[in-house]
Amino acid sequence: SAASDVYKRQVQGRLIGGCVDCLVNLLGTTYDKTTGFVEKYKNDGMIWFLESCDLNVMAIRRAVWQMKHAGWFSHVKAFLIGRPAVYGQELMGLDQYHAVWDLLKDYGVPVIMDVDIGHLAPMMPLVCGSYATVQVNGNDISVKMEYL
């Protein structure tokens, strides 16, 4: 039945992420403390949340590629991807979904797209460093954050 085909998933871990436009500019600088945070909480696992404001789909892809190859996604348990400000844009056959999916699918963890985070309303605030339980049921998502 169609009801049994609904995507359902629950995952727990530390929330880390934000606006890709800003994060990629910190990568490799003295302000980049990502690897230390990821290692400190590796037993919890990471739930990365990413969204973009000013980047086009090609720039989003390049930024996520750079984050991936810098080792930021070690110990990842899931990715929450917000709708970018360029929602619906396609450049040379690349859309917002394949810009990230093609790079993140190798981790073998859930990649949840079009999450209500970021620069497009509606937007749900997420607290970096909180311990989260994310539940997905079809198009519905809930995020419970604990401050441990």
Task: Mark where each language-model region is.
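Active-site helix-to-loop segments that bind/position phosphate- or nucleotide-bearing substrates
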Residues: G13, D32-K33, Q66-A70
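Short, small-residue-biased leader/transition segments that mark boundaries at the very start
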Residues: A2-Y7
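C-terminal active-site/capping subdomain that shapes the small-molecule cofactor and substrate pocket
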Residues: N56-L148
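Structural motif
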Residues: G13-R14, D21, M46-W48, K77-L80, ...
